Amino acid sequence: MSLFGVGFLAFAKGKRVCAIGRSSLGKISDPLEVPNLLDLQLDSFDWLIGGPRWRAALDAYRKNPSGAPIAEKSGLDEVFDEISPIEDSAGNMQLNFSKPVLEAEELSVRECRVRGRTYSAPLYVEAEFMNHDTGEIKTQTVFMGDFPLMTDKGTFVINGTERVVVSQLVRSPGVYFERTPEKNSEKDLFSGRIIPARGAWLEFEVDRHDQLGVRVDRKRRQPVIFFLRAIGMTDDEIRDAFGEFESISVQHEKNIGLSRDDALREIYRRVRPGEQASAEAGRALLENFYFTSRRFDLARVGRYKVNRKLGVDVDPTRMVLTRSDIIATIRYLAALHLGFSEVAVLNSNKSVPISTDDIDHLGNRRIRPVGELVQNQLRAGLARMERVVRERMTTQDIEAIIPQTLINVMPIVAALKEFYGTSQLSQFMDQNNPLAGLTHKRRLSALGPGGLSRERAGVEVRDVNPSHYGRMCPIETPEGPNIGLIGSLACYSRVNSFGFIETPYRRVVNGKVTDDIEYMTATQEDEHAIAQASTPLRPDNSFVDERVLVRRKGGEVEVVPADQVDYMDVSGRQMVSVATSLIPFLEHNDANRALMGSNMQRQAVPLLVTESPLVGTGMERYVAIDAGDVLIAEDPGIVGDVSADVVTVKQDDGKHRDYHVGKFVRSNQGNCYNQRVVVRSGDRVEKGTVLADGPCTDKGELSLGRNLLVAFMPWEGYNFEDAIIISQNLVKDDTLSSIHIEEHEVSTRDTKLGSEEITRDLPNVSMDYIKDLDERGIIRIGAEVGPGDILVGKVTPKGETELSAEERLLRAIFNEKSMEVRDTSLKVPHGQQGTVIDVKLFDAVDGEDKLGAGINQRVVVYIAHKRKITEGDKLAGRHGNKGVISKILPVEDMPFMADGTPVDIILNPLGVPARMNFGQVLETHLGWISKQGWKIEGDPDWAKDIRVREAQPDSRVSSPVFDGISEGEITGLFSSVFPNRDGERAVGSDGKAILYDGRTGEPFPEPISVGYMYVLKLHHLVDDKIHARSTGPYSMITQQPLGGKAQFGGQRFGEMEVWALEAYGAAHALQELLTIKSDDVVGRVKVYDAIVKGYPIPTPGVPESFKVIVKEMQSLCINIEVVSDGEDDVSADAETLQIEEGLDTSPKVEVGSLEEV
């Protein structure tokens, strides 16, 4: 067995098998394995289509009904049952749908990516048409369109690109009570509202005069007694239900003679002012608003919330309002207004506690995962289709009707296409690295349809709530306008069938911690006292201390006796997200820097050579495997044939399975996703064993950067303000080099003048330009290309005048095409270069490829470019410590240690204290210790909690978040590090070493902190940002150059820059900048001409912006004239001047976008 095989078997835990044996320096042993990090996406979509994961969960719930109930129907079954039956207006016909089935997909995920198609399966439904007059039933299996499928990585492939549907965080349906202080007095006003998943709101409120009112569908307020009468309550029923509440009794006595019909008319008048009010219209209005399932839907979660809050015992499957719901809501609000602590439930011997609701509490916010979002879109499509079906029922001959003739699937297909293609929640997948993709799938967004908007969202909804603990990460969120609106699911959390986030806890019985795990929602958790994971335990799992620190409702902390503790956290990393849990010594960092560290790990570029971190947190293997970018054995067996592209495994059941290895695939962000085989022929593999590493993985562990020898010291001012100095060795050895792949595409279409053509025969192009094109006119694989080089030769017909007979004869003799076609070849854009690594040709005429309307052929060319690290590139650590490379020093000039080892990177020590991210210093120290290896002699006090007594040089260690190694233990380990060959230790117990100046050989005056830090190269590369322009496009409106690299624009010389030149008196430079380099239209053409012909630069003219200010002043009735000492009319517009000068500006000045950047 090979070395790799031995390594894989050496470190296996659960379903994830890792080749790197990482020694944990944590004190807590986690009783619960980290769950599959993609469960949120996979489980939800599986419920939608009724897949095996949902069926297994349903079977398990039926055997042991605990926690939130699992939905009895799949999402597709639910939505087709809702729409059935569709009846015509007379009730003579009806159409029913049942048994939705997804057939096998047409193309594999890989083929869809290559061909630019959508990964989907045809959806069929059994449709049954019934004619009530004759009793005839016609049944057909009907095609309902192609239904996009989720890949096993939790993504969708739409038109060849990978997309992710982000889960939405919305307010849960239910009943809510809130207190708002009145503006002009110290009195508090109370209100209660019933919010459905779909339909009209019902709101009750107490005004400043202590009168209870109601708002129907958010319209005008009216006395609550009108509403009670309208729903059919008698005087006696009102007295029985509300006799104890004076505010309602007084209203009742005033309106004692009010009939139900009068109340209905009054309600209709207030909801529909201006229309003829009648009792029947009022009855229909209320029926449609609150008591009809087609118009009002509480949803399962809304019914659960209403029953739980009000204590009513309504059937959980009843999704409309009941009279008992309304009575209980009014009683609750009246009791809240009077300051009661609890209210009795009518017709029951129980009572419910009274409190107002915190709308930002996660017990009142729920997740709409991908399955529910797609189901809602399907529901909208079916509603549009329903209208078409009803219309066709009335227009078609009843005898000839079959289900197929009634159904038009276009509204359904359009609804799904619109959702996946344009919805705010269907996003282009972040494939910068595996962590970025995984985090994207676990993202929670409060934005989107039915959610908040970033302009209206206040501080409260963005802020961290105590209920976020263990459910939503308090650290990982964007820094810009979306801060707090977009979050990330915590490591151990899961979403229950109601959409509430649950987190696991260990049950504590009589002061003893058990291994029983219980998942709780934020509402359930509020009722218990919960200890933290780091609470010290004895070997028998009882608490060491008699009094234990616990967390209670609202995040309040108190110390209670051990026997009063109900639960305990399962892990120190329970409260944070996946990205944040990858930061070692997180507990020593300021939260702002931890946020930056979490976000910047997602920007790390996959490097040419991967290397796992010396100091990790233990989460690296979970992320690498669950992200889906490593190749994993699905069944145990023996590795057979191994090549760069395919690994064959002979499984224990006798079957041979081929695993295809991805080679140099372009990710959505233009990075190189490449897999490398890590097993050899003859190796034994188990289920879950890593067969091939993906991008940013090293032997099955996430590896985003490189371990570099770092020194914290200033060096000649080059690392001022976060700038970074690196060694030439990092460039020479490709330590931080990365490969980037660009995709270039061209299509041929049918035009009015004829078809475009891909060809090598291009007009007016020399052989030098087409030497690398093949006979088809497409670049050969392996060609080195630069800016302006032709990738695909293409000609387009152009219109021309009628030719004379002589011209036609000459053209026939010399076969000259240049006059009838123009060159529209695909060329390498400005600023790009590299090697052609792949070419794909899709043909709509000969092949089976489905291209767009009017497109005959499509060619895609992939160009790879290796980018070495260079000045201007951005580097970062995992602690929010980021900087730009300012200087690459020759290795001989770098500071070196006593044994001659030069450091790789020099950081400014002043970057640490102000940022308060001290974790980077501890990582540097522990990195040095693990690189050197250690052996603890004897039994010193500082080592009593360290389980790893000895580690070999270059060992990998983990310091879990909130459970890391202490500073005292690090200090002790420095004295246990293996010495060098001369018996000396290069770094002292304070983590510092004497460094020598590479230029002089003299030692620096003070010892310097030296160690190994994990450094990431971020996707902010200087090659993508550097830009220069000589001539280019101008804005049509201002006649000034466009802005930005994308528009090939100029560099803005703004107001303050002008002041600077004025201060220096640089009049000629300033005049040049404000005229011929900007918006002096005639002058810049003259200057271009003069430069080309070698003449002196002419005098600048008048810029367009000056003419604008003159016109503006004239428009303000200020008579301003420009007087010239010559004969020129200075105020004439540019076009007039061009005509007078006889200038043609078209070749030099392109009319660009109207947008100014």
UniProtKB/Swiss-Prot annotation:
One cellular-component annotation, GO: DNA-directed RNA polymerase complex
GO annotation, biological process: DNA-templated transcription
InterPro entries attached to this UniProt entry: DNA-dir_RNA_pol_bsu_ext_1_sf (IPR042107), DNA-dir_RNA_pol_bsu_external_1 (IPR019462), DNA-dir_RNA_pol_su2 (IPR015712), DNA-dir_RNAP_su2_dom (IPR007120), DNA-dir_RNAP_su2_hyb_sf (IPR037033), RNA_pol_bsu_bac (IPR010243), RNA_pol_bsu_CS (IPR007121), RNA_pol_bsu_protrusion (IPR007644)
GO molecular function: DNA binding; DNA-directed RNA polymerase activity; ribonucleoside binding
Catalytic activity: RNA(n) + a ribonucleoside 5'-triphosphate = RNA(n+1) + diphosphate
Keywords (A to Z) from UniProt: DNA-directed RNA polymerase, Nucleotidyltransferase, Transcription, Transferase
Gene3D superfamilies recorded: 2.40.50.100, 2.40.50.150, 3.90.1100.10, DNA-directed RNA polymerase, beta subunit, external 1 domain, DNA-directed RNA polymerase, subunit 2, domain 6, RNA polymerase alpha subunit dimerisation domain, RNA polymerase Rpb2, domain 2
Pfam families, alphabetized: RNA_pol_Rpb2_1, RNA_pol_Rpb2_2, RNA_pol_Rpb2_3, RNA_pol_Rpb2_45, RNA_pol_Rpb2_6, RNA_pol_Rpb2_7
EC number: 2.7.7.6
Biological role: DNA-dependent RNA polymerase catalyzes the transcription of DNA into RNA using the four ribonucleoside triphosphates as substrates.
HAMAP family assigned to the protein according to its UniProt record, in alphabetical order: RNApol_bact_RpoB
Subunit structure: The RNAP catalytic core consists of 2 alpha, 1 beta, 1 beta' and 1 omega subunit. When a sigma factor is associated with the core the holoenzyme is formed, which can initiate transcription.
Family, similarity comment: Belongs to the RNA polymerase beta chain family.
The protein's name in its UniProt record: DNA-directed RNA polymerase subunit beta
High-level lineage: Bacteria, Bacillati, Actinomycetota, Actinomycetes, Micrococcales
